[in-house]
Structure formats: C-alpha cells, structure tokens
Regions:
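Terminal substrate-recognition subdomain of acyl/acetyltransferases
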Residues: 2-165
Length: 165
C-alpha cells in the first residue's frame, strides 16, 4: 500500500499494551519528499532509540521495521577488518559492538540477518543491548562464551555470503 513507518511510540498504550505507529505515504511530490525525510531521520535515530525504548520488542517486529530503512552507513576497510577479526575470534565482542551496530545500517544487512537462525540472539544482544545474563535467562544461549561464538559464526557467514559491504 506504500505506507512507510516514520515513527514508533516511545511508550506502550495503556489500554492495549501496543506501541503506537505512525506511517506515511506521500501522494504529492512534496509529500513524498517529506515521507523520505522522516524515514531517513527515523533510520538515523533507530540505533539510539531501540535499546532505550524498545528493548523488549520482538526481534521479528524490529526486523519488519528496520528492513525497510534506507542504508545509512558504509563500512570502511578498518571496520571490515574488525568484523573479520571478530569472526575469527581475534577481537572481543565489546570492542566490535560499535561496528556491529553500524553493520546493521548497511544496505541489505538486516534482511539477511532476519533470515538467520541466530537473528533473535543478534537482535537481543547487538540491537537491543541486552546483557549476556538476560539472553541466557531468556534461553537464547547458555552464556556469553556460547553467545559470542554464535555471533562470531554469524558474522563470518555474513561476510562470506551476505550483501556487499
């Protein structure tokens, strides 16, 4: 239908427990430009807002919103090296987290990740900022060591078979 998510409420509605969503489809040229500006802005704000306001949202819901965002980041040679080193176990998770967050904003990455079996783990730890203990309690991994190993494997697969970075 052409509607695009331009805003997601910061608080759940009291009556339904749902987050309000604002969607827009410009019908005139100026309306289309406005819609694009709002989508671009929402995409830029997304990485900051998700862990603060939507940390409990289901990974498939987050993916459904984020997959429609325009690419807002590009990786440089240093970033790609960090990802390779992380996937090979030579760089720590916390040191790589800024690049992992940036990776989500590259063209086609969220769509590729959303199809991966470990996307819920990625989403909870990388996108939503859950602690390793929280993902363990949620049953997504047995702890940090196993969780990091699975994320390393996922990044390695993305580098080999994912979208061009």
């Amino acid at each position: 239908c052409g509607l695009r998510v331009v805003r997601l409420g910061l608080r759940q509605e009291a009556s339904t427990g749902e987050f309000p969503v604002q969607m827009l489809c410009g019908v005139s040229e100026s309306g289309q430009q406005l819609a694009q500006r709002l989508v671009d802005r929402f995409a830029r704000h997304w990485p900051v807002l998700v862990p603060r306001h939507w940390a409990g949202l289901a990974p498939d819901v987050l993916a459904a919103v984020a997959v429609r965002f325009p690419a807002s980041a590009r990786l440089d040679a240093d970033d790609r090296r960090d990802l390779m080193n992380f996937s090979e176990g030579c760089r720590g998770f916390e040191l790589t987290l800024p690049v992992l967050r940036q990776l989500e904003q590259c063209a086609g990455v969220v769509a590729w990740l959303a199809d991966a079996p470990d996307f819920p783990l990625w989403c909870r730890v990388v996108t939503q900022g859950w602690s390793w203990n929280a993902v363990r309690v949620a049953g997504l991994c047995s702890g940090q060591k196993e969780g990091e190993a699975r994320l390393r494997k996922l990044v390695g697969e993305l580098l080999k078979n994912g979208p061009e970075l």
